[in-house]
């Protein structure tokens, strides 16, 4: 775009909001628990305390000779005993949202005991169990020390010992609990103990729902396997398939893969040796199924050898489909581990959560004001569509609010570069779709902003899981229209505690006229704004909670103003399910046109 078109948007003078009320009761309770724990420790009755690290990685290996791995009879047995300024907030009244819950409300799914098998004891104290108690191989122990981990998280302390003992595990743990290390350590130890070599082919396969999560797991595996001789690699859509195939033929002992690309290689890559597979890990199983890979997973399970294979399945939620996948992938009677079943909240304890109610035409100005105030923080902003991310990133960068953007329509190299740039940045703003909402371990995120609300409380939980990880604190803010307040009832059922945040109107930068002038004069931004506006309506029309998110009740004049239009443009939107097509896209694009069933919207603002 030409620089002469540039029109700067001026903001109000320096502003701030009142500091949040502190919860003294929680602080006193924590002090009391620390004193009690110290007393128990003195008496020798306390096993452990809350670990300070979240993402730990570990490996277990078994001996292997020539081309055929020996049987794994000598498995090591382990016992499993069992400053930034924030808006003022207020607790909303219980009767403030008058919404009748109906059959569309997501209900907690249960799993069959026949599938789950034995349960590890949830009442056992697993705090501060050191990794040194696991008797891991020297290379793995050294790698864990280099990574800065000393003690295990609860999911690691409850999962790693039975996995080292060769058991199958079905694990349920909230995001940020350290489960990546929980399955990587036994996997690496397994390959090491079996002395896998490239000629033996693949011994461990780890399946991940998204490319970004696959890259992250691969990065952790790389650190963990630094002192080992085994080979490792990643397979994912968007990467060079021929280069992947060449490496597979040479022999890759540990593979991290997305479902579609893995199935492709299993079916079509000659020379890919996976007959010696000894461990299968399915991470974020619920998400894999949600985005439409149920049939691919069934085919993968059918193609992989099951004899003498250890399997691990991790899922944040236990749905019927997850249970069915566990039934076909795990051996009978797996150990079921749920580290969250005794917790009162579904989100992290150190997470401060709030929501703000504002009309559509105030949304961008409030977001702009918030981001300007938090430029020195690390912030992730979630949108419902790729085009909306693209438009807001172009606009904010144009008006001197530097941001990064990440969504499913970007080429893989762009996504990868953006992902690692944000991870390594001490501060910054990332605009994204739900492609970044699951499993990714992004350090030191201060704020999660859900500019477009999710359609399901589970998606809300996964989004806010990008902050307050590994015992650290974090904050989240959910934007809601007045008509969307009923969503709070669903969050309450899902055990998500929120306070209402109030932003003083005089503190919000009134840049509407400048925004409309810029969009009307800059052709490039105008086109991008039109695409973002259309995609926002498409995504809204695809929401399943129609009584709360009803596209026909939107004030389009106000929605148009949020995208910089004095008069909302005429656009065609698909009122079919965006998710239906999205589910087939391994990119996890949140902005697909769906089927060509069209509705026409123009100038339908409320009087």
Swiss-Prot record:
SUPFAM superfamilies: P-loop containing nucleoside triphosphate hydrolases. PROSITE patterns: DEAD_ATP_HELICASE, HELICASE_ATP_BIND_1, HELICASE_CTER, Q_MOTIF. GO terms for biological process: rRNA processing. Residues 52-121, 576-607 are annotated as: Disordered. It comes from the Eukaryota. Keywords: ATP-binding, Helicase, Hydrolase, Nucleotide-binding, Nucleus, Ribosome biogenesis, RNA-binding, rRNA processing. It catalyses: ATP + H2O = ADP + phosphate + H(+). A motif (Bipartite nuclear localization signal) lies at residues 362-378. Its main location: nucleus. It is found in: Nucleus, Nucleolus. Residues 81-92 have a biased composition (Basic and acidic residues). Its EC number is 3.6.4.13. It is an enzyme of class 3 (hydrolase). It holds the Pfam family DEAD. GO terms for molecular function: ATP binding; ATP hydrolysis activity; RNA binding; RNA helicase activity. ATP binds at residues 173-180. Gene3D superfamilies: P-loop containing nucleotide triphosphate hydrolases. The Q motif is unique to and characteristic of the DEAD box family of RNA helicases and controls ATP binding and hydrolysis. ATP-dependent RNA helicase involved in 40S ribosomal subunit biogenesis. Required for the processing and cleavage of 35S pre-rRNA at sites A0, A1, and A2, leading to mature 18S rRNA. Belongs to the DEAD box helicase family. DDX18/HAS1 subfamily. This is ATP-dependent RNA helicase HAS1.
């Amino acid at each position: 775009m030409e620089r002469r078109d540039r029109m700067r948007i001026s903001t109000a003078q320096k502003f701030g909001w009142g500091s949040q009320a502190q919860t003294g009761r929680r602080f006193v309770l924590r002090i009391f628990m620390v004193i009690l724990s110290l007393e128990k420790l003195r008496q020798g009755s306390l096993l452990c305390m809350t670990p300070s690290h979240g993402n730990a990685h570990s490996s277990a290996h078994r001996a292997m000779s020539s081309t055929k791995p020996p049987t794994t009879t000598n498995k090591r047995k382990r016992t499993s005993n069992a400053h930034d300024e924030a808006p003022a907030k207020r607790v909303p009244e219980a009767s403030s949202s008058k919404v009748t819950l109906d059959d569309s409300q997501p209900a907690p799914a249960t799993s069959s005991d026949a599938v789950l098998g034995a349960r590890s004891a949830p009442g056992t104290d697993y705090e501060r169990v050191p990794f040194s108690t696991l008797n891991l191989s020297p290379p793995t122990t050294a790698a864990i020390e280099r990574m800065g981990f000393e003690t295990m998280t609860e999911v690691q302390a409850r999962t790693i010992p039975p996995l080292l003992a060769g058991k199958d595990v079905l694990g349920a743990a909230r995001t940020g609990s350290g489960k990546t290390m929980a399955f990587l350590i036994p996997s690496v130890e397994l390959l090491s103990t079996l002395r896998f070599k490239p000629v033996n082919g693949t011994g461990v396969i780890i399946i991940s729902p998204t490319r970004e999560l696959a890259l992250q797991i691969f990065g952790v595996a790389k650190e963990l396997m630094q002192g080992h001789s085994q080979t490792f690699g990643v397979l994912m859509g968007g990467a060079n398939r021929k280069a992947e195939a060449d490496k597979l033929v040479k022999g890759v002992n540990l593979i991290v893969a997305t479902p579609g690309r893995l199935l492709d290689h299993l079916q079509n890559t000659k020379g890919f040796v996976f007959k010696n597979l000894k461990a299968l890990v399915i991470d974020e199983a619920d998400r894999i199924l949600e985005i439409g890979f149920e049939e691919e997973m069934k085919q993968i399970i059918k193609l992989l050898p099951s004899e003498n294979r250890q399997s691990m399945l991790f899922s944040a939620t236990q749905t019927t489909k997850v249970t069915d996948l566990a039934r076909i992938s795990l051996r009978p009677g797996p150990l079921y581990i749920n580290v969250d079943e005794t917790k009162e909240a579904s989100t992290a304890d150190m997470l401060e959560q709030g929501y703000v109610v504002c009309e559509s035409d105030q949304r961008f100005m409030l977001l702009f004001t918030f981001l300007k105030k938090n430029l020195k923080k690390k912030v992730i902003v979630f949108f419902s569509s790729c085009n909306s991310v693209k438009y807001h990133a172009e606009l904010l960068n144009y008006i001197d609010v530097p941001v990064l953007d990440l969504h499913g329509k970007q080429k893989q190299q762009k996504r990868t570069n953006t992902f690692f740039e944000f991870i390594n940045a001490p501060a910054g703003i990332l605009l994204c779709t739900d492609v970044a909402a699951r499993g990714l371990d992004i350090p030191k995120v201060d704020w999660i902003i859900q500019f477009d609300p999710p359609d399901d409380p589970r998606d809300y939980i996964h989004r806010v899981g990008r902050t307050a990880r590994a015992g650290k604190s974090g904050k989240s803010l959910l934007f809601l229209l007045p008509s969307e307040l009923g969503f709070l009832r669903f969050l309450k059922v899902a055990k998500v505690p929120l306070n209402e945040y109030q932003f003083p109107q005089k503190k919000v930068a009134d840049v509407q006229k400048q925004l409309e002038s810029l969009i009307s004069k800059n052709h490039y931004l105008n086109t991008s704004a039109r695409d973002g506006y259309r995609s926002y309506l498409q995504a809204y029309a695809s929401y399943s909670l129609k009584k709360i998110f009803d596209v026909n009740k939107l004030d389009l004049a106000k929605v148009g103003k949020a995208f910089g239009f004095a008069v909302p443009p005429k656009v065609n939107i698909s009122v079919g399910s965006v998710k239906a097509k999205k589910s087939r896209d391994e990119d996890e694009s949140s902005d697909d046109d769906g089927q060509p069933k069209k509705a026409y919207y123009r100038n339908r603002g409320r009087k």
